[in-house]
Design a protein with these regions (language model features):
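Phosphate- and other anionic-substrate recognition elements at nucleic-acid/protein interfaces
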Residues: 1-108
Length: 108
């Protein structure tokens, strides 16, 4: 069965928040039209699920991802960066959204 998970809005986000909101609205409408269920998980909840801390920074999230999966995305995708940047942080967040959906929806 189909089910979509999304990370909720970060209320302190900067940049193109209107574009993000616009596109998310369209996505939600299309999912509703197709009767595909949607679960939105807040950024704080994703961080708490991954690390036990709702205010975990990108470094801690990436470190936990490496512990959980054995993959060093930072080294593989952005070896020249001293900080965790995209796409690494987006992939890490997506992993934990999927993991949470698995436990809530698939695994019962």
């Amino acid at each position: 069965r189909q089910h979509v998970g999304l990370e909720g809005y970060a209320f302190n986000a900067k940049g193109k928040v209107f574009n993000i909101a616009e596109n998310t609205g369209i996505l939600k409408y299309k999912l509703w039209q197709q009767r595909i269920p949607l679960t939105v998980i807040s950024p704080t909840e994703i961080k708490r699920l991954a690390t036990g801390k709702g205010n975990a920074d990108k470094e801690l999230m990436t470190r936990q991802f490496r512990i959980d999966t054995g993959l060093n995305l930072k080294q593989e995708l952005t070896p020249k960066s001293s900080k965790v940047i995209n796409p690494v942080s987006d992939i890490v967040d997506s992993y934990y959204v999927c993991k949470e959906l698995w436990y809530k929806i698939i695994d019962f």
